[in-house]
């Protein structure tokens, strides 16, 4: 039996989570390694706001159903496509929700031995 996979996603930030969301329905086998939104949680200054507007702060999924706007509506957070700054905390929470919803197979690890 082979442990071969088609794709390995290293990282679970916005790009890695988006890649996983798109790979789910392709028929390709994949594994994803990382801690969701780790850099955003650990390295960004507390209290900061994103430079991007709400409409430009979405992670990507095939159906475009898991947008920042959808998350804010679900969690009763304020949202505007333009003109309302996106807080770091809200963006992190959005990314964590996205991971739970669309990257359920995420292997939360930083151990490089589990990847090779």
Language model: regions and residue ranges:
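Active-site helix/loop of acyl-thioester processing domains in fatty-acid/polyketide metabolism
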Residues: 98
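Conserved small/polar residues in nucleotide/adenosyl-binding loops
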Residues: 113-116
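Non-catalytic DNA-binding core/recognition domains of DNA-processing enzymes
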Residues: 92
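Short loop/edge segments at beta-strand edges and connector loops
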Residues: 106-110
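N-terminal Rossmann-like FAD-binding beta1-loop-alpha1 element of flavoenzymes
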Residues: 2-32
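Glycine-rich active-site loop/strand segments that organize a redox cofactor
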Residues: 29, 33-89
């Amino acid at each position: 039996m082979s442990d071969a996979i088609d794709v390995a996603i290293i990282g679970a930030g916005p790009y890695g989570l988006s890649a996983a969301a798109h790979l789910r329905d392709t028929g390709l086998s994949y594994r994803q390694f990382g801690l969701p939104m780790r850099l955003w949680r650990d390295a960004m200054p507390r209290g900061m706001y994103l430079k991007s507007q709400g409409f430009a702060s979405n992670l990507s999924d095939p159906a475009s159903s898991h947008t920042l706007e959808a998350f804010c509506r679900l969690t009763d957070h304020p949202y505007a496509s333009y003109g309302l700054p996106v807080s770091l905390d809200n963006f992190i929470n959005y990314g964590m929700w996205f991971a739970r919803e669309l990257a359920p197979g995420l292997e939360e690890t930083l151990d490089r031995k589990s990847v090779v």
